[in-house]
Amino acid sequence: MPKFYCDYCDTYLTHDSPSVRKTHCSGRKHKENVKDYYQKWMEEQAQSLIDKTTAAFQQGKIPPTPFPGAPPPGGSLLPHPSIGGPPRPGMLPAPPMGGPPMMPMMGPPPHAMMPGGPGPGMRPPMGGPMQMMPGPHMMRPPARPMMPAVRPGMVRPDR
């Protein structure tokens, strides 16, 4: 009778039957071995990706990513209009702090776009306040209570 070999545990089981395999596979030691195997596999995959990316970068296939705040290549960095000083000719004035930008000749934004929440179709910033998502806890109760199905000839408990 052939024996069952477990690659994760590097061991042979006493005999090849579904009940022995099921018992072995539900054991603590087997589960730890499986977890360790896939953990090592993921680490190898990540290291392989890092090595490939590093090699491509060193060969010049991947351009260096500019750091935030670094001047763009071949140009000078102009100060942002909101960093003090009067607006330059041809530029709109800086938006008020804490509010959305206003377009010229349009007046203030509608109430839905006031500070304190994102406007319609906009997401809150990363790390900002989380909005509640509708879910089972926010659903309305049924319009009428659900009654058990009654077969013809059976007596309903409420009558």
Swiss-Prot record:
Residues 61-99 are annotated as: Disordered. One of its GO terms (molecular function) is U1 snRNA binding. Disruption phenotype: Still contains stable, but U1-C-deficient U1 snRNPs. Changes the alternative splicing patterns of a large set of specific target genes. Results in an early embryonic lethality at about 5 days post-fertilization. It comes from the Eukaryota. It is found in: Nucleus. A zinc finger (Matrin-type) spans 4-36. Coiled coil: none annotated. Pfam families: zf-U1 (PF06220). Signal peptide: none annotated. Residues 63-74, 84-99 have a biased composition (Pro residues). One of its GO terms (cellular component) is commitment complex. Keywords: Metal-binding, Nucleus, Ribonucleoprotein, RNA-binding, Zinc, Zinc-finger. One of its GO terms (biological process) is spliceosomal snRNP assembly. Component of the U1 snRNP. The U1 snRNP is composed of the U1 snRNA and the 7 core Sm proteins snrpb, snrpd1, snrpd2, snrpd3, snrpe, snrpf and snrpg that assemble in a heptameric protein ring on the Sm site of the small nuclear RNA to form the core snRNP, and at least 3 U1 snRNP-specific proteins snrnp70/U1-70K, snrpa/U1-A and snrpc/U1-C. snrpc/U1-C interacts with U1 snRNA and the 5' splice-site region of the pre-mRNA. Belongs to the U1 small nuclear ribonucleoprotein C family. Component of the spliceosomal U1 snRNP, which is essential for recognition of the pre-mRNA 5' splice-site and the subsequent assembly of the spliceosome. snrpc/U1-C is directly involved in initial 5' splice-site recognition for both constitutive and regulated alternative splicing. The interaction with the 5' splice-site seems to precede base-pairing between the pre-mRNA and the U1 snRNA. Stimulates commitment or early (E) complex formation by stabilizing the base pairing of the 5' end of the U1 snRNA and the 5' splice-site region. This is U1 small nuclear ribonucleoprotein C. The gene is snrpc.
